[in-house]
Design a protein with these regions (language model features):
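Extended alpha-helical, oligomerization-prone segments that build pores/tubes and scaffolds
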Residues: 1-155
Length: 155
């Protein structure tokens, strides 16, 4: 998720990426998560198109944000948290607190849409454009196959 209305994701002051993680795996990697797993965010069932069981999963948020340093240069920081528990924060890391996550200060993703959407860094490509057409072609082929089979039966 980025700030609505920006056309370049690098212009957004915050960038959020959400993922579903298994609670047991979270507790084994991050001991501070013990007793804090569960569904505190309602987005878990909307992250994936498929209807998957989210009872033993938690939403983990990767938050990238830009803040000016003492000289006014924008520095990129990163915070990973789940259900209000901070799992990692670059501002708390002595090696990254001043210089940020990356020296270039840019978010770690690049959008390369074929057809851009208005007021958004996202877009779509030929697969998005042709998906419905291909579905119609497949249904038509199936109908012709069935019709051919029915017409070829001996009477």
């Amino acid at each position: 998720y980025w700030e609505p209305g920006v056309e370049d994701v690098q212009d957004s002051p915050n960038l959020f990426s959400l993922s579903l993680e298994n609670n047991d795996r979270l507790e084994s990697i991050y001991p501070q998560m013990a007793g804090h797993t569960g569904s505190s965010l309602d987005t878990a069932k909307y992250i994936h198109d498929d209807s998957i069981d989210t009872t033993d999963k938690s939403v983990v948020v990767d938050w990238y944000y830009k803040r000016p340093d003492a000289s006014g240069r924008m520095v990129l920081h990163y915070c990973k948290f789940c259900n209000g528990v901070v799992l990692y924060a670059s501002q708390n890391d002595p090696a990254l607190a001043e210089r940020g996550l990356y020296d270039h200060g840019q978010y770690p993703l690049v959008f390369d849409p074929l057809f851009r959407e208005e007021d958004s860094p996202a877009g779509f490509g030929y697969i998005d454009v042709m998906k419905d057409t291909q579905t119609a072609i497949d249904e038509m082929n199936h109908a012709m196959d069935e019709n051919g089979k029915l017409a070829a039966k001996a009477r």
